[in-house]
A protein has these predicted regions:
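Flexible, low-complexity junctional segments that flank or bridge functional domains
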Residues: 1-154, 166, 227-229, 235, ...
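C-terminal "post-core" interaction segments
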Residues: 81, 85-89, 114, 118, ...
Length: 289
């Protein structure tokens, strides 16, 4: 029902049924790692790759949703590794007290990374959430206010391609109350599983000169969601906006391309070596010599 529309923000729910589509056919990553068991093995392989390269055991802190804490991190003598896979930190709208705890957790992580030479940020399979939270995290990696994206909303009653004026959204490091900023070389890991607010994070990070992205294109699911009930009381959401990069490029449907393309396959499980992490380490070693 929703598949021909090729839009991951279109959902129809009712009578126990849920119709949605994540931009057409399964992505190469989804074809390779097509169930929860394989994805669990994928992350185990990532952790083994880090261990093989003298990183410590991956630790986790923060709010827990569906058995998974918000932030994952570890470090070697020279480099840090930081992962977060959602921008809805509590699974619901987060409150002021929640944000206080989130900032405390982020401060704990990045104070421990202060003396390191470089950082890997892994957002592969980031499921989305709140764009504001993505900017909250991105504000840890810049010392100046930067334009992160533009948005435009459809004009009510207007033509299909009629939108209001561009609205700029900024990453402001002065608004995140960080006790430590990381301004050294960063490699950002992406893939087709990064959607919505995860892509907002990627787009913002792409504006920073010390960041290199590695992996594959993101999902290309950016729009705000217009939610309403159909006459039969089924719930529906439609896309009613568009997001543009600071240079006014549209990535809806195509996703944001990385600087360097590296693809994960099931063969990585057999080798217990993640080529995306290995490329990130190669880049960091080159940039920090």
């Amino acid at each position: 029902m929703a598949k021909p529309l090729k839009d991951g923000h279109i959902h129809i729910e009712g009578n126990g049924s849920n119709y949605y589509n994540e931009n057409g056919d399964p992505s190469p990553f989804d074809q390779e790692f097509h169930n929860d068991s394989l994805r669990t093995e994928f992350w185990q392989m990532v952790h083994q790759t880090l261990s093989n390269n003298r990183f410590g055991v991956v630790d986790s802190i923060g709010f827990e949703v569906d058995g998974e804490k918000l932030f994952h991190f570890t470090k070697s003598e020279d480099f840090g590794y930081f992962r977060f896979l959602r921008s809805d930190p509590t699974g619901e709208s987060y409150t002021g007290p929640d944000l206080v705890q989130i900032r405390k957790d982020l401060n704990t992580i990045f104070e421990d990374f202060e003396e390191l030479k470089g950082l890997i940020i892994d957002v592969r399979l980031h499921r989305g959430g709140y764009p504001e939270f993505s900017f909250e995290v991105a504000g840890r990696f810049t010392d100046k206010k930067i334009l992160g994206r533009f948005t435009q909303s459809r004009i009510s009653g207007g033509a299909y391609d009629e939108f209001d004026s561009l609205k700029g959204h900024y990453v402001d490091p002065d608004q995140v109350y960080a006790t430590s900023k990381f301004l050294k070389p960063i490699v950002l890991l992406t893939n087709e599983g990064v959607g919505s607010a995860g892509e907002v994070f990627v787009m913002a990070m792409d504006q920073m000169a010390h960041v290199t992205s590695v992996g594959t294109n993101t999902a290309g699911i950016f729009s705000f969601m217009y939610e309403f009930n159909l006459p039969n009381e089924w719930w529906c959401s439609l896309s009613n906006s568009r997001t543009l990069s600071p240079d006014q490029q549209l990535y809806e449907g195509t996703g944001i391309p990385p600087d360097i393309i590296v693809q994960n396959t099931r063969k990585d499980l057999a080798s217990q070596s993640d080529p995306v992490v290995m490329k990130a380490l190669e880049i960091l070693n080159e940039q920090t010599q």
